[in-house]
Amino acid sequence: MYSIKMRASKNGKHISGAERIVNKDEIEDVARELIKRALTHENGTPDFINIKIEEIKEDIEYIDHLPIKTIHCKNKEEAREKAREILRNEGIPDKVIDYAYEIIDKGGMRGAAILNLKGERLEPDKERGVRVKNIDTTKELKEKILKEKLGTERTVDAIAIASKVIHLGVIAELCTSDNKSYTTGYVATKRGYFRITNLKKEGESGGRVFFVKNDVNIEDLIDKLENKPFIIK
């Protein structure tokens, strides 16, 4: 199996990224698909596209996806309160949730911020954040999500990230999309992947925050988030 990663930017600013895990005979078609995705992204036409293809030599772990649930909210205020309620149920203090919203509102990070329950930021590079890599979903899961209208193409990408993150011991994830027209965000916990409509306003940037225990081994967690291969089924 091979990992194909795409990253696109303009004037040094991140525009889009995606990843697939494929068989050797799928590499050419999937690479072409990811290049097209980069060139047609709503955030703009990139002046730099990087495609990285490498063989996966480590055993790939197959895990079940988190249960998908959708919560419909009328506006951002209602949606944020619903997300807060889910996070509170996992023992995350309000002041830490407030800080997470500040990070997301600021925008501009390629990866995720990591907060412990004291509200301390643990990612080594506060500008870059931590990227969850070496992940994909099975074709069957993608078809199920789209056919049963459990979500969109963006949900397919997000459920892969969320399922891996929670499996590795992260308490919860809070995320809104970089796509300025896509206003549905999510909270992921061991209880499920909660899609929340109107978690941001149209035109706003997005962001991602992982909430972890105070005694987390942060170096080990980041290594697994970035390098351990998972396929979500």
Swiss-Prot record:
Record has Cell inner membrane as a keyword: no
Keyword Cell inner membrane: no
Organism classification: Archaea, Methanobacteriati, Methanobacteriota, Methanomada group, Methanococci
NCBIfam families on file: bioW (TIGR01204), PRK01322.1 (NF002360)
GO MF annotation list: 6-carboxyhexanoate-CoA ligase activity; ATP binding; magnesium ion binding
Descriptive protein name: 6-carboxyhexanoate--CoA ligase
Required cofactor names: Mg(2+)
Subunit record text: Homodimer.
Function: Catalyzes the transformation of pimelate into pimeloyl-CoA with concomitant hydrolysis of ATP to AMP.
UniProt keyword annotations, A-Z: ATP-binding, Biotin biosynthesis, Ligase, Magnesium, Nucleotide-binding
Top-rank taxon, per record: Archaea
InterPro entries, per database record: BioW (IPR005499)
Family note: Belongs to the BioW family.
Pathway, per record: Metabolic intermediate metabolism; pimeloyl-CoA biosynthesis; pimeloyl-CoA from pimelate: step 1/1
EC number(s) on file: 6.2.1.14
Example of a GO biological process term: biotin biosynthetic process
Catalysed reaction, written as an equation: heptanedioate + ATP + CoA = 6-carboxyhexanoyl-CoA + AMP + diphosphate
